[in-house]
């Protein structure tokens, strides 16, 4: 179980305490830092809708350090990012894998960024099958439909041919941020703003 840090701020009415995610939300920053599942996705969708309703012209920053997760839940976040009027910038700060990479490339054109030591990975995803033969047939069709949906989404954002995407996504396909930029998943790599101090 993770511990959520709290921030104490001085206001005109005294001290106010926020959990770190609520404080970031005040500055229109959303942090995607866990595997994607339905409850987490509902929270991210609600945050996007709130910030869009508050000011549809002001940018939302989404920081991503995500190993992936459930496809349906991830698509709910993706669709909401593309639905709202507020511009969304995405920044990878560690990993953006599987559905995490879909969210990373869903940022507005020119606003999809990654830090220099981050890693991005795309693949087809996986599904566990259980049930009798008719159920397995239905599930197999749905997995193929989801695969085609994801390939269409990657194609829309990268302009790469469907055949290349299908080939690359047959296995885990890892990229540095510079490779992801060439691939079309992101627009630029954020270089460090501070240089390390020279060793004595």
Swiss-Prot record:
Q: Which InterPro entries match?
A: ClpP, ClpP/crotonase-like_dom_sf, ClpP/TepA
Q: Which positions are catalytic residues? A: 98 (nucleophile), 123
Example GO BP: protein quality control for misfolded or incompletely synthesized proteins
Per its UniProt entry, what is the enzyme's top EC class, as one word?
hydrolase
Indicate the segments annotated as coiled coil, or none if absent: none
EC numbers for this chain: 3.4.21.92
CDD domains under this entry?
S14_ClpP_2
- Whether Hydrolase counts among this entry's keywords is yes
This protein's UniProt keywords: Cytoplasm, Hydrolase, Protease, Serine protease
Please tell me where this protein is predominantly located.
Answer: cytoplasm
Query: Which Gene Ontology molecular-function terms are recorded?
Result: ATP-dependent peptidase activity; ATPase binding; serine-type endopeptidase activity
Is Cell wall biogenesis/degradation given among the entry's keywords?
A: no
Q: Which reaction does it catalyse?
A: Hydrolysis of proteins to small peptides in the presence of ATP and magnesium. alpha-casein is the usual test substrate. In the absence of ATP, only oligopeptides shorter than five residues are hydrolyzed (such as succinyl-Leu-Tyr-|-NHMec, and Leu-Tyr-Leu-|-Tyr-Trp, in which cleavage of the -Tyr-|-Leu- and -Tyr-|-Trp bonds also occurs)
Compartments, as annotated in UniProt: Cytoplasm
A Gene Ontology term for the protein's cellular component: cytoplasm
Q: How does it assemble?
A: Fourteen ClpP subunits assemble into 2 heptameric rings which stack back to back to give a disk-like structure with a central cavity, resembling the structure of eukaryotic proteasomes.
* Entry function: Cleaves peptides in various proteins in a process that requires ATP hydrolysis. Has a chymotrypsin-like activity. Plays a major role in the degradation of misfolded proteins.
Protein family membership: Belongs to the peptidase S14 family.
Query: What name goes with this protein?
Result: ATP-dependent Clp protease proteolytic subunit
Organism listed in the record: Deinococcus geothermalis (strain DSM 11300 / CIP 105573 / AG-3a)
């Amino acid at each position: 179980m993770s511990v959520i840090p709290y921030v104490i701020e001085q206001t005109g009415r005294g001290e106010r305490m926020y959990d770190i995610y609520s404080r970031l939300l005040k500055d229109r920053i959303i942090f995607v830092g866990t595997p994607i599942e339905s409850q987490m996705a509902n929270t991210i969708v609600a945050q996007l809708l709130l910030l869009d309703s508050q000011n549809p012209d002001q940018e939302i920053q989404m920081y991503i350090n995500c190993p992936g997760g459930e496809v349906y839940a991830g698509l709910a976040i993706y669709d909401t990012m593309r639905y709202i009027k507020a511009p969304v910038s995405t920044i990878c700060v560690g990993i953006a894998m599987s559905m995490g990479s879909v969210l990373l490339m869903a940022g507005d054109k020119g606003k999809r960024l990654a830090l220099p030591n981050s890693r991005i990975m795309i693949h087809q995803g996986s599904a566990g099958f259980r049930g009798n033969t008719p159920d397995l047939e239905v599930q197999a069709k749905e997995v193929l439909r989801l695969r085609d949906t994801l390939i269409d989404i990657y194609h829309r954002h990268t302009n790469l041919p469907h055949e290349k995407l299908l080939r690359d996504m047959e296995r885990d396909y890892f990229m540095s941020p510079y490779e992801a930029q060439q691939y079309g998943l992101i627009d630029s790599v954020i270089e460090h703003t501070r240089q390390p101090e020279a060793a004595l």
